[in-house]
Regions:
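Glycine-centered loop/turn motifs
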Residues: 399, 468, 491-493
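Short, solvent-exposed secondary-structure boundary/capping segments
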Residues: 488-500
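Long, low-complexity segments enriched in small/aliphatic residues
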Residues: 192, 197, 215, 348-443
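Long, low-complexity intrinsically disordered regions
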Residues: 515-533
Length: 533
Protein backbone atom coordinates (compact mmCIF):
# COMPACT_ATOMS: atom_id res chain seq x y z
CA UNK A 1 0.00 0.00 0.00
CA UNK A 2 2.88 2.39 0.76
CA UNK A 3 5.82 0.72 -0.98
CA UNK A 4 8.10 -0.10 1.98
CA UNK A 5 8.14 -3.14 4.26
CA UNK A 6 9.34 -1.44 7.42
CA UNK A 7 8.61 1.29 9.96
CA UNK A 8 7.68 4.51 8.21
CA UNK A 9 9.27 6.50 11.02
CA UNK A 10 12.21 6.30 13.41
CA UNK A 11 12.33 4.99 16.95
CA UNK A 12 13.75 8.25 18.28
CA UNK A 13 10.72 10.12 16.90
CA UNK A 14 8.45 8.31 19.37
CA UNK A 15 9.49 10.58 22.24
CA UNK A 16 8.08 13.59 20.37
CA UNK A 17 4.73 12.10 19.40
CA UNK A 18 1.45 13.42 20.78
CA UNK A 19 -0.58 10.23 20.37
CA UNK A 20 0.35 6.54 20.38
CA UNK A 21 -1.96 3.79 19.19
CA UNK A 22 -0.33 0.54 20.35
CA UNK A 23 -2.10 -2.55 19.05
CA UNK A 24 -1.08 -6.19 19.31
CA UNK A 25 2.21 -5.25 20.96
CA UNK A 26 3.30 -6.10 24.50
CA UNK A 27 6.01 -3.50 24.01
CA UNK A 28 7.50 -3.36 27.50
CA UNK A 29 8.31 -7.08 27.44
CA UNK A 30 8.99 -7.70 23.75
CA UNK A 31 10.64 -4.35 22.88
CA UNK A 32 11.72 -2.77 26.19
CA UNK A 33 13.96 -0.11 24.63
CA UNK A 34 11.19 1.10 22.33
CA UNK A 35 8.83 1.02 25.31
CA UNK A 36 11.15 3.43 27.12
CA UNK A 37 10.58 5.95 24.33
CA UNK A 38 6.82 5.42 24.63
CA UNK A 39 6.95 5.99 28.39
CA UNK A 40 8.95 9.16 27.81
CA UNK A 41 6.34 10.43 25.35
CA UNK A 42 3.53 9.80 27.85
CA UNK A 43 5.48 11.57 30.61
CA UNK A 44 5.76 14.55 28.27
CA UNK A 45 2.00 14.64 27.75
CA UNK A 46 1.29 12.27 24.87
CA UNK A 47 -1.96 10.33 24.95
CA UNK A 48 -1.90 6.56 24.51
CA UNK A 49 -4.52 4.04 23.44
CA UNK A 50 -3.70 0.34 23.79
CA UNK A 51 -5.69 -2.35 21.96
CA UNK A 52 -4.91 -5.79 23.35
CA UNK A 53 -6.87 -8.76 24.74
CA UNK A 54 -4.61 -8.66 27.83
CA UNK A 55 -4.08 -5.82 30.25
CA UNK A 56 -0.36 -5.41 29.49
CA UNK A 57 1.91 -3.04 31.43
CA UNK A 58 1.32 -0.19 28.99
CA UNK A 59 -2.38 -0.20 29.85
CA UNK A 60 -1.39 1.17 33.27
CA UNK A 61 -0.23 4.43 31.69
CA UNK A 62 -2.65 4.49 28.75
CA UNK A 63 -5.63 6.81 28.49
CA UNK A 64 -7.72 3.95 27.11
CA UNK A 65 -7.50 0.17 26.92
CA UNK A 66 -9.54 -1.41 24.13
CA UNK A 67 -9.67 -4.99 25.44
CA UNK A 68 -10.94 -6.73 22.34
CA UNK A 69 -11.68 -10.41 21.81
CA UNK A 70 -8.67 -12.08 20.12
CA UNK A 71 -9.00 -12.16 16.35
CA UNK A 72 -11.50 -9.29 16.01
CA UNK A 73 -9.02 -6.57 15.04
CA UNK A 74 -10.61 -5.88 11.64
CA UNK A 75 -13.96 -5.14 13.30
CA UNK A 76 -12.28 -2.73 15.72
CA UNK A 77 -10.19 -0.94 13.09
CA UNK A 78 -12.97 -0.70 10.52
CA UNK A 79 -15.26 0.73 13.20
CA UNK A 80 -12.64 3.36 14.02
CA UNK A 81 -12.36 4.18 10.32
CA UNK A 82 -16.18 4.29 10.07
CA UNK A 83 -16.22 6.91 12.83
CA UNK A 84 -13.54 9.00 11.14
CA UNK A 85 -15.52 9.05 7.87
CA UNK A 86 -18.89 9.59 9.57
CA UNK A 87 -17.65 12.54 11.62
CA UNK A 88 -15.78 14.22 8.76
CA UNK A 89 -12.33 13.75 10.29
CA UNK A 90 -10.56 12.54 7.13
CA UNK A 91 -7.67 14.46 5.57
CA UNK A 92 -9.43 15.11 2.27
CA UNK A 93 -6.49 17.02 0.79
CA UNK A 94 -4.05 14.15 1.41
CA UNK A 95 -6.55 11.58 0.12
CA UNK A 96 -7.09 13.51 -3.12
CA UNK A 97 -3.40 14.12 -3.73
CA UNK A 98 -1.83 10.81 -2.75
CA UNK A 99 -4.35 7.94 -2.75
CA UNK A 100 -6.79 5.90 -4.81
CA UNK A 101 -9.70 3.66 -3.86
CA UNK A 102 -11.22 5.74 -1.09
CA UNK A 103 -14.79 5.51 -2.41
CA UNK A 104 -14.62 1.71 -2.38
CA UNK A 105 -13.30 1.82 1.18
CA UNK A 106 -16.16 4.05 2.33
CA UNK A 107 -18.70 1.58 0.95
CA UNK A 108 -17.08 -1.20 2.95
CA UNK A 109 -16.87 0.86 6.14
CA UNK A 110 -20.59 1.62 6.04
CA UNK A 111 -21.16 -1.94 7.32
CA UNK A 112 -18.93 -1.46 10.39
CA UNK A 113 -20.57 0.98 12.84
CA UNK A 114 -19.10 0.92 16.37
CA UNK A 115 -22.37 -0.37 17.82
CA UNK A 116 -22.08 -3.55 15.75
CA UNK A 117 -18.35 -3.73 16.44
CA UNK A 118 -19.10 -3.81 20.17
CA UNK A 119 -21.02 -7.08 19.73
CA UNK A 120 -18.06 -8.85 18.11
CA UNK A 121 -15.07 -7.21 19.79
CA UNK A 122 -16.48 -6.64 23.28
CA UNK A 123 -15.18 -3.05 23.18
CA UNK A 124 -17.81 -0.40 24.02
CA UNK A 125 -18.92 1.60 20.98
CA UNK A 126 -18.21 4.92 22.67
CA UNK A 127 -14.64 3.82 23.47
CA UNK A 128 -14.11 3.01 19.79
CA UNK A 129 -15.41 6.44 18.80
CA UNK A 130 -13.25 8.24 21.37
CA UNK A 131 -10.12 6.42 20.22
CA UNK A 132 -10.88 7.19 16.57
CA UNK A 133 -11.46 10.88 17.26
CA UNK A 134 -8.28 11.22 19.28
CA UNK A 135 -6.20 9.53 16.58
CA UNK A 136 -7.71 11.45 13.67
CA UNK A 137 -7.48 14.89 15.28
CA UNK A 138 -3.86 14.64 16.45
CA UNK A 139 -1.25 15.52 13.85
CA UNK A 140 1.69 13.65 15.38
CA UNK A 141 -0.10 10.34 15.91
CA UNK A 142 1.74 7.05 15.39
CA UNK A 143 0.53 3.45 15.14
CA UNK A 144 2.76 0.71 16.58
CA UNK A 145 2.06 -2.99 16.15
CA UNK A 146 3.75 -6.37 16.31
CA UNK A 147 2.87 -10.05 16.15
CA UNK A 148 -0.48 -9.59 17.87
CA UNK A 149 -1.60 -8.13 14.55
CA UNK A 150 0.20 -10.43 12.11
CA UNK A 151 -0.02 -13.89 13.74
CA UNK A 152 -3.54 -14.54 12.49
CA UNK A 153 -5.07 -16.22 9.46
CA UNK A 154 -6.21 -12.72 8.54
CA UNK A 155 -3.03 -10.92 9.61
CA UNK A 156 -2.60 -9.21 6.24
CA UNK A 157 -6.15 -7.86 6.52
CA UNK A 158 -5.27 -6.46 9.95
CA UNK A 159 -2.31 -4.58 8.49
CA UNK A 160 -4.40 -3.28 5.58
CA UNK A 161 -6.99 -1.99 8.06
CA UNK A 162 -4.28 -0.15 10.00
CA UNK A 163 -2.84 1.30 6.80
CA UNK A 164 -6.28 2.56 5.80
CA UNK A 165 -6.43 4.52 9.07
CA UNK A 166 -3.05 6.10 8.34
CA UNK A 167 -3.98 7.11 4.80
CA UNK A 168 -7.44 8.52 5.55
CA UNK A 169 -6.01 10.77 8.27
CA UNK A 170 -2.90 11.89 6.37
CA UNK A 171 -0.54 10.52 9.01
CA UNK A 172 1.95 9.36 6.37
CA UNK A 173 5.20 11.25 5.81
CA UNK A 174 4.80 13.12 9.11
CA UNK A 175 7.44 12.97 11.83
CA UNK A 176 6.40 11.06 14.97
CA UNK A 177 3.44 9.52 13.15
CA UNK A 178 3.08 6.82 10.49
CA UNK A 179 2.64 3.04 10.61
CA UNK A 180 5.34 1.24 12.55
CA UNK A 181 5.76 -2.55 12.74
CA UNK A 182 8.13 -3.43 15.57
CA UNK A 183 10.16 -6.42 14.41
CA UNK A 184 10.02 -9.60 16.47
CA UNK A 185 13.77 -10.30 16.59
CA UNK A 186 17.04 -8.44 16.15
CA UNK A 187 17.91 -8.18 12.44
CA UNK A 188 14.65 -9.64 11.17
CA UNK A 189 14.48 -6.41 9.19
CA UNK A 190 18.00 -6.94 7.87
CA UNK A 191 17.29 -10.55 6.88
CA UNK A 192 14.23 -9.45 4.92
CA UNK A 193 16.18 -6.58 3.38
CA UNK A 194 18.76 -9.10 2.14
CA UNK A 195 16.14 -11.28 0.46
CA UNK A 196 15.48 -13.99 3.07
CA UNK A 197 11.88 -14.29 1.86
CA UNK A 198 10.26 -16.55 -0.74
CA UNK A 199 9.06 -13.67 -2.94
CA UNK A 200 11.85 -11.06 -2.92
CA UNK A 201 15.47 -10.69 -3.91
CA UNK A 202 17.57 -8.19 -1.89
CA UNK A 203 15.99 -4.77 -1.60
CA UNK A 204 12.40 -6.04 -1.94
CA UNK A 205 12.71 -6.71 -5.67
CA UNK A 206 10.13 -9.24 -6.86
CA UNK A 207 11.21 -12.76 -7.77
CA UNK A 208 8.38 -12.78 -10.33
CA UNK A 209 9.68 -9.67 -12.15
CA UNK A 210 11.64 -10.84 -15.23
CA UNK A 211 13.78 -7.68 -15.34
CA UNK A 212 14.77 -8.10 -11.70
CA UNK A 213 15.46 -11.78 -12.21
CA UNK A 214 17.63 -11.02 -15.24
CA UNK A 215 19.68 -8.50 -13.27
CA UNK A 216 20.48 -11.02 -10.56
CA UNK A 217 21.12 -13.82 -13.06
CA UNK A 218 23.73 -11.66 -14.80
CA UNK A 219 25.36 -10.64 -11.52
CA UNK A 220 25.50 -14.16 -10.09
CA UNK A 221 26.07 -16.13 -13.27
CA UNK A 222 23.23 -18.59 -12.66
CA UNK A 223 19.74 -19.30 -13.95
CA UNK A 224 17.14 -18.43 -11.31
CA UNK A 225 13.67 -19.84 -10.78
CA UNK A 226 10.75 -17.93 -12.26
CA UNK A 227 8.50 -18.98 -9.38
CA UNK A 228 8.11 -17.72 -5.84
CA UNK A 229 9.40 -20.03 -3.14
CA UNK A 230 7.53 -21.57 -0.22
CA UNK A 231 7.06 -19.72 3.03
CA UNK A 232 8.04 -21.51 6.24
CA UNK A 233 4.53 -22.60 7.18
CA UNK A 234 3.97 -24.16 3.75
CA UNK A 235 7.39 -25.83 3.96
CA UNK A 236 6.47 -27.50 7.24
CA UNK A 237 3.21 -28.80 5.80
CA UNK A 238 4.88 -30.07 2.62
CA UNK A 239 7.55 -31.75 4.73
CA UNK A 240 4.83 -33.55 6.70
CA UNK A 241 3.30 -34.71 3.41
CA UNK A 242 6.66 -36.10 2.32
CA UNK A 243 7.19 -33.61 -0.52
CA UNK A 244 10.31 -32.09 1.05
CA UNK A 245 13.08 -34.62 1.68
CA UNK A 246 15.94 -32.38 2.80
CA UNK A 247 16.21 -29.38 5.07
CA UNK A 248 18.90 -26.81 5.88
CA UNK A 249 18.07 -25.08 9.18
CA UNK A 250 19.92 -21.91 10.24
CA UNK A 251 19.32 -20.21 13.58
CA UNK A 252 15.84 -21.72 13.99
CA UNK A 253 14.48 -24.21 16.50
CA UNK A 254 11.64 -25.69 14.47
CA UNK A 255 10.37 -28.15 17.08
CA UNK A 256 9.94 -25.36 19.63
CA UNK A 257 8.95 -22.40 17.45
CA UNK A 258 6.57 -23.81 14.83
CA UNK A 259 2.84 -24.42 15.42
CA UNK A 260 1.25 -27.87 15.54
CA UNK A 261 4.70 -29.20 16.32
CA UNK A 262 3.65 -32.86 16.38
CA UNK A 263 3.13 -32.61 12.64
CA UNK A 264 6.48 -30.84 12.28
CA UNK A 265 8.21 -33.72 14.08
CA UNK A 266 6.49 -36.23 11.80
CA UNK A 267 7.89 -34.34 8.83
CA UNK A 268 11.39 -34.12 10.29
CA UNK A 269 11.37 -37.86 10.93
CA UNK A 270 10.46 -38.41 7.29
CA UNK A 271 13.25 -36.25 5.87
CA UNK A 272 16.18 -38.01 4.21
CA UNK A 273 18.75 -35.43 5.30
CA UNK A 274 18.74 -32.50 7.72
CA UNK A 275 21.53 -29.98 8.35
CA UNK A 276 21.44 -27.70 11.39
CA UNK A 277 23.63 -24.59 11.55
CA UNK A 278 23.44 -22.96 14.98
CA UNK A 279 25.43 -21.76 17.98
CA UNK A 280 23.86 -24.32 20.37
CA UNK A 281 22.42 -27.81 20.13
CA UNK A 282 18.75 -26.88 20.29
CA UNK A 283 15.69 -29.16 20.28
CA UNK A 284 15.79 -29.53 16.49
CA UNK A 285 19.33 -30.93 16.71
CA UNK A 286 17.80 -34.28 17.71
CA UNK A 287 16.68 -34.69 14.09
CA UNK A 288 19.86 -33.42 12.39
CA UNK A 289 22.20 -35.62 10.37
CA UNK A 290 24.90 -32.93 10.33
CA UNK A 291 25.44 -30.03 12.73
CA UNK A 292 27.53 -27.06 11.60
CA UNK A 293 28.72 -24.93 14.54
CA UNK A 294 28.14 -21.24 13.88
CA UNK A 295 29.56 -18.08 15.43
CA UNK A 296 27.39 -15.85 17.61
CA UNK A 297 27.02 -12.10 17.11
CA UNK A 298 30.10 -11.22 19.18
CA UNK A 299 32.27 -13.67 17.23
CA UNK A 300 31.72 -12.24 13.75
CA UNK A 301 31.45 -8.95 11.90
CA UNK A 302 28.66 -7.61 9.71
CA UNK A 303 25.61 -5.38 10.00
CA UNK A 304 22.30 -5.54 11.83
CA UNK A 305 19.30 -3.55 10.59
CA UNK A 306 16.75 -2.71 13.24
CA UNK A 307 13.04 -1.99 13.03
CA UNK A 308 13.40 1.58 11.80
CA UNK A 309 15.60 0.62 8.81
CA UNK A 310 18.75 1.67 10.67
CA UNK A 311 21.84 -0.21 9.45
CA UNK A 312 24.54 -0.54 12.13
CA UNK A 313 27.86 -2.35 12.28
CA UNK A 314 28.40 -5.44 14.39
CA UNK A 315 32.08 -5.75 15.25
CA UNK A 316 33.80 -8.99 16.11
CA UNK A 317 34.91 -8.98 19.75
CA UNK A 318 36.33 -12.50 20.23
CA UNK A 319 37.20 -15.49 18.08
CA UNK A 320 34.56 -18.23 17.83
CA UNK A 321 35.31 -21.37 19.85
CA UNK A 322 36.46 -24.66 18.35
CA UNK A 323 35.24 -25.29 14.82
CA UNK A 324 32.57 -22.59 14.91
CA UNK A 325 32.64 -20.17 11.98
CA UNK A 326 30.75 -17.15 10.70
CA UNK A 327 27.60 -18.03 8.74
CA UNK A 328 28.83 -16.41 5.52
CA UNK A 329 32.03 -18.46 5.58
CA UNK A 330 30.08 -21.71 6.00
CA UNK A 331 27.67 -20.82 3.19
CA UNK A 332 30.45 -19.86 0.79
CA UNK A 333 32.24 -23.17 1.36
CA UNK A 334 29.00 -25.10 0.87
CA UNK A 335 28.35 -23.31 -2.41
CA UNK A 336 31.85 -24.12 -3.65
CA UNK A 337 31.46 -27.76 -2.59
CA UNK A 338 28.22 -27.86 -4.60
CA UNK A 339 30.04 -26.63 -7.70
CA UNK A 340 29.28 -22.91 -7.72
CA UNK A 341 32.34 -20.63 -8.04
CA UNK A 342 31.55 -18.43 -5.06
CA UNK A 343 33.87 -15.39 -4.97
CA UNK A 344 36.66 -15.31 -2.38
CA UNK A 345 35.14 -12.49 -0.33
CA UNK A 346 37.44 -10.53 1.96
CA UNK A 347 34.66 -10.29 4.52
CA UNK A 348 31.16 -9.00 5.25
CA UNK A 349 31.93 -5.51 3.92
CA UNK A 350 32.52 -6.84 0.41
CA UNK A 351 29.35 -8.95 0.56
CA UNK A 352 27.31 -5.90 1.56
CA UNK A 353 28.84 -3.91 -1.30
CA UNK A 354 27.63 -6.59 -3.71
CA UNK A 355 24.10 -6.36 -2.32
CA UNK A 356 24.12 -2.55 -2.39
CA UNK A 357 25.19 -2.58 -6.05
CA UNK A 358 22.10 -4.65 -6.91
CA UNK A 359 19.53 -3.05 -4.58
CA UNK A 360 18.82 0.68 -5.15
CA UNK A 361 17.45 1.16 -1.61
CA UNK A 362 20.92 0.43 -0.21
CA UNK A 363 23.15 1.86 -2.95
CA UNK A 364 24.61 4.56 -0.73
CA UNK A 365 25.28 2.32 2.27
CA UNK A 366 28.63 0.68 2.98
CA UNK A 367 30.57 -0.48 6.02
CA UNK A 368 33.00 2.37 5.45
CA UNK A 369 30.25 5.01 5.54
CA UNK A 370 28.69 3.49 8.67
CA UNK A 371 32.09 3.59 10.35
CA UNK A 372 32.03 7.34 9.74
CA UNK A 373 28.37 8.11 10.50
CA UNK A 374 27.51 5.49 13.14
CA UNK A 375 24.45 4.31 11.22
CA UNK A 376 22.40 4.93 8.07
CA UNK A 377 18.70 4.45 7.43
CA UNK A 378 17.48 3.20 4.08
CA UNK A 379 16.48 4.22 1.53
CA UNK A 380 19.90 5.65 0.90
CA UNK A 381 20.25 5.69 -2.89
CA UNK A 382 23.67 7.33 -3.28
CA UNK A 383 26.95 7.74 -1.44
CA UNK A 384 26.20 11.40 -0.69
CA UNK A 385 22.67 10.69 0.58
CA UNK A 386 22.23 11.15 4.37
CA UNK A 387 19.70 8.34 4.77
CA UNK A 388 15.96 8.59 5.42
CA UNK A 389 14.66 8.84 9.00
CA UNK A 390 11.04 9.42 7.90
CA UNK A 391 9.59 7.74 4.81
CA UNK A 392 7.07 9.28 2.39
CA UNK A 393 7.71 12.93 3.31
CA UNK A 394 7.22 13.86 -0.36
CA UNK A 395 4.29 11.48 -0.78
CA UNK A 396 4.14 7.68 -0.96
CA UNK A 397 7.36 6.26 -2.41
CA UNK A 398 5.34 4.20 -4.92
CA UNK A 399 3.71 7.40 -6.20
CA UNK A 400 0.12 6.79 -5.14
CA UNK A 401 -1.03 4.75 -2.15
CA UNK A 402 -4.08 2.54 -2.58
CA UNK A 403 -6.76 1.92 0.03
CA UNK A 404 -7.45 -1.78 0.62
CA UNK A 405 -11.00 -2.45 1.86
CA UNK A 406 -11.11 -5.53 4.10
CA UNK A 407 -13.97 -7.46 5.63
CA UNK A 408 -13.91 -9.29 8.94
CA UNK A 409 -13.16 -13.00 8.72
CA UNK A 410 -13.38 -15.29 11.71
CA UNK A 411 -10.26 -16.99 13.02
CA UNK A 412 -9.67 -20.49 11.74
CA UNK A 413 -10.57 -22.07 15.09
CA UNK A 414 -13.14 -20.72 17.52
CA UNK A 415 -14.05 -21.92 21.03
CA UNK A 416 -16.89 -24.40 21.45
CA UNK A 417 -18.36 -26.61 24.18
CA UNK A 418 -15.41 -29.04 24.03
CA UNK A 419 -12.67 -26.40 23.87
CA UNK A 420 -14.27 -23.28 25.39
CA UNK A 421 -11.22 -21.02 25.84
CA UNK A 422 -9.14 -18.95 23.41
CA UNK A 423 -5.39 -19.44 23.82
CA UNK A 424 -2.88 -16.80 22.72
CA UNK A 425 0.88 -17.25 22.99
CA UNK A 426 3.79 -14.86 23.19
CA UNK A 427 7.02 -13.75 24.84
CA UNK A 428 7.92 -12.67 28.35
CA UNK A 429 10.45 -10.13 29.55
CA UNK A 430 12.89 -12.71 30.89
CA UNK A 431 13.26 -15.10 27.96
CA UNK A 432 13.87 -14.62 24.27
CA UNK A 433 11.91 -16.64 21.70
CA UNK A 434 12.87 -20.34 21.97
CA UNK A 435 15.09 -19.46 24.97
CA UNK A 436 18.02 -21.32 23.41
CA UNK A 437 20.25 -18.58 24.83
CA UNK A 438 18.39 -17.16 27.83
CA UNK A 439 17.75 -20.52 29.53
CA UNK A 440 21.52 -20.99 29.64
CA UNK A 441 21.78 -17.86 31.79
CA UNK A 442 21.24 -18.04 35.55
CA UNK A 443 19.43 -14.72 35.95
CA UNK A 444 16.52 -15.26 33.52
CA UNK A 445 16.04 -18.84 34.74
CA UNK A 446 15.82 -17.66 38.37
CA UNK A 447 13.17 -15.10 37.40
CA UNK A 448 11.12 -17.53 35.32
CA UNK A 449 11.76 -21.25 35.63
CA UNK A 450 8.95 -22.90 33.71
CA UNK A 451 5.75 -22.67 31.76
CA UNK A 452 2.56 -21.12 33.12
CA UNK A 453 -0.92 -20.23 31.96
CA UNK A 454 -2.62 -16.92 32.76
CA UNK A 455 -6.33 -17.48 33.46
CA UNK A 456 -9.24 -15.26 34.46
CA UNK A 457 -10.44 -16.01 37.99
CA UNK A 458 -13.91 -17.09 36.89
CA UNK A 459 -12.56 -19.45 34.22
CA UNK A 460 -10.25 -21.04 36.79
CA UNK A 461 -13.14 -21.29 39.24
CA UNK A 462 -15.19 -23.34 36.79
CA UNK A 463 -12.75 -26.25 37.19
CA UNK A 464 -11.79 -25.54 40.80
CA UNK A 465 -8.25 -24.41 39.92
CA UNK A 466 -6.33 -22.02 42.18
CA UNK A 467 -3.24 -19.89 41.76
CA UNK A 468 -0.17 -22.16 41.63
CA UNK A 469 -2.08 -25.34 40.72
CA UNK A 470 -0.78 -27.55 37.95
CA UNK A 471 -3.24 -28.12 35.11
CA UNK A 472 -3.35 -29.82 31.74
CA UNK A 473 -4.03 -27.61 28.74
CA UNK A 474 -5.54 -29.46 25.78
CA UNK A 475 -6.32 -28.54 22.18
CA UNK A 476 -7.32 -30.58 19.14
CA UNK A 477 -3.62 -31.15 18.45
CA UNK A 478 -2.02 -31.98 21.79
CA UNK A 479 -1.70 -31.38 25.52
CA UNK A 480 0.82 -29.78 27.90
CA UNK A 481 1.10 -29.08 31.62
CA UNK A 482 1.36 -25.61 33.10
CA UNK A 483 1.13 -23.75 36.40
CA UNK A 484 -1.98 -21.62 36.85
CA UNK A 485 -1.54 -17.87 37.30
CA UNK A 486 -4.85 -16.27 38.24
CA UNK A 487 -4.53 -12.99 36.38
CA UNK A 488 -6.65 -9.83 36.35
CA UNK A 489 -4.97 -9.07 33.02
CA UNK A 490 -7.08 -11.64 31.16
CA UNK A 491 -10.48 -11.35 29.51
CA UNK A 492 -12.99 -14.00 30.51
CA UNK A 493 -12.81 -16.88 28.07
CA UNK A 494 -9.17 -16.17 27.17
CA UNK A 495 -5.90 -17.68 28.41
CA UNK A 496 -2.27 -16.89 27.62
CA UNK A 497 0.95 -18.95 27.66
CA UNK A 498 4.63 -18.22 26.90
CA UNK A 499 6.40 -19.94 24.02
CA UNK A 500 9.82 -20.45 25.62
CA UNK A 501 9.84 -23.80 27.39
CA UNK A 502 10.99 -27.04 25.77
CA UNK A 503 9.67 -29.23 28.60
CA UNK A 504 6.08 -28.10 27.97
CA UNK A 505 5.98 -26.90 24.40
CA UNK A 506 2.97 -24.68 23.93
CA UNK A 507 3.21 -25.23 20.18
CA UNK A 508 1.94 -28.75 20.68
CA UNK A 509 -1.38 -26.90 21.08
CA UNK A 510 -1.27 -24.16 18.45
CA UNK A 511 -2.92 -24.17 15.05
CA UNK A 512 -0.80 -24.17 11.87
CA UNK A 513 -3.50 -22.53 9.75
CA UNK A 514 -1.78 -19.58 8.09
CA UNK A 515 -2.47 -16.20 6.54
CA UNK A 516 -3.33 -16.61 2.86
CA UNK A 517 -0.75 -14.02 1.77
CA UNK A 518 2.19 -14.42 4.16
CA UNK A 519 1.62 -17.90 5.55
CA UNK A 520 2.12 -16.59 9.10
CA UNK A 521 0.47 -19.09 11.48
CA UNK A 522 -2.36 -18.19 13.84
CA UNK A 523 -0.41 -18.27 17.11
CA UNK A 524 -2.82 -15.81 18.70
CA UNK A 525 -6.06 -17.80 18.46
CA UNK A 526 -6.62 -21.49 19.12
CA UNK A 527 -9.33 -23.27 21.09
CA UNK A 528 -8.31 -25.07 24.31
CA UNK A 529 -9.66 -26.38 27.60
CA UNK A 530 -7.93 -26.74 30.95
CA UNK A 531 -8.23 -29.66 33.34
CA UNK A 532 -6.97 -30.20 36.87
CA UNK A 533 -4.29 -32.86 37.15
Amino acid sequence: MFGAGAMTNSIDEIRDTDFLFVIGSNTTEAHPIIAMEMKRAVRQGARMVVADPRAIWLTEIADMHLQLTPGTDVWLLNAMAHTIVEEGLCDEQFIAAHTTGFDALKKTLASYPPERAEITTGVPAESIRRAARAYATTRKAGIYYTLGITEHTHGTDNVYALANLVLMTGHLGVRSAGLNPLRGQNNVQGANDAGATPVFYPGYQRVSDPDVRGKFENAWGVELSRDDGMNLNVMMKEMARGTIKGLFVMGEDLVLSEPNVSRVEEGLNGCDFIVLQDIFLNETARFADVVLPAACFAEKGGVFTNSDRRVQLVRKAVDPPGDARADWEILCDLARAAGYPMPAYDGPAEIYDEMAALAPKFSGISHRRIEETGDLQWPCPSTDHPGTPTLHEDGPVIGTAHFEPVHYRESDELPDSEYPLILSTGRTLYHYNSATQTRRERGPVMKQRGSFIEVHRRDAGKIGAHDGDEVRVLSRRGAVKATVVISPRMRRGCVWMPMHFAEERVNLLTNDAGDSVTGTPEFKVCAVRIERT
